Design a protein with these regions (language model features):
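Conserved AdoMet/S-adenosylmethionine-binding subsite of the radical SAM
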Residues: 76-219
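Conserved Radical SAM active-site core
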Residues: 1, 8, 20-21, 32-112
Length: 219
């Protein structure tokens, strides 16, 4: 596997916001989002080739029962099943951050998925499939990074369709701003004006970009 970095920090977003976790960042992605803030994990050769067992060993060495596997896009790696299975077996509650353009490989008791549905501002919305979002469970997270009213419309449409399938969207739904692109109050007002987002979604900001310099790595 191509490992870009591994470090300990706090969760900056999602259902574990503020909790200390071990972050495993894998290199490589099948998308090229316009606002990507981790291009160093997408392009170039800033990575080391390591086996899944070595990543597990290093993760466990921190002594923290939580991990986030991110990228890039972690689900495109051949050893991802082996990695997640081993983390699960060792009792590590693992959040897998995926871009919505790769199928969820399997389910394990200690593993959940955070799917980032790509809105039009990303330039990658054509890669999204409702079937992938519909496969998320109550343990998972679906997030929308928005930078325009059109993005909010897209999020509203997806959440409404998921709610029609299940009675509620099933995963916990978050709406986040593209950093620096749209005023927070405008996003919140937009959520209030859209029924599905008002009823089911939560607004969030990336906490780590408030605590540290937004461009800082390893946090």
């Amino acid at each position: 596997m191509r490992l870009n970095e591994i470090f300990m920090s706090i969760e900056g977003e999602g259902i574990r916001t503020g909790a200390t976790s071990v972050f495993v960042r894998l290199h490589g992605c099948n998308l090229r989002c316009s606002y990507c803030d981790t291009l160093y994990a997408v392009e170039g050769d800033d990575f080391a080739e390591v086996h899944a067992e070595e990543i597990v060993r290093r993760t466990l060495s921190y002594g923290i029962p939580r991990a986030t596997v991110t990228g890039g896009e972690p689900l495109i790696h051949g050893e991802i099943r082996e990695l997640l299975e081993a983390l699960d077996r060792n009792g590590v509650e693992t959040n897998v951050e995926t871009n919505g353009a790769a199928d969820i490989p399997a389910r394990w008791p200690n593993v959940f998925y955070t799917m980032d549905w790509k809105t039009p501002t990303s330039g990658m919305s054509g890669a999204m499939r409702m079937s992938r979002a519909a496969s998320l469970t109550e343990r998972d997270v679906l997030k929308f990074v928005v930078g325009s009213e059109r993005d909010l419309d897209e999020a509203e449409s997806v959440v409404r369709e998921l709610a029609s399938l299940h009675g509620d969207p099933r995963p916990t739904v978050y709406v986040s701003p593209v950093f620096g692109a749209m005023p927070y109050d405008r996003i919140v007002e937009g959520m209030r004006m859209r029924t599905a987002l008002r009823d089911f979604a939560r607004f969030q900001v990336q906490l780590h970009k408030i605590v540290w310099d937004p461009k800082r790595r390893g946090v």
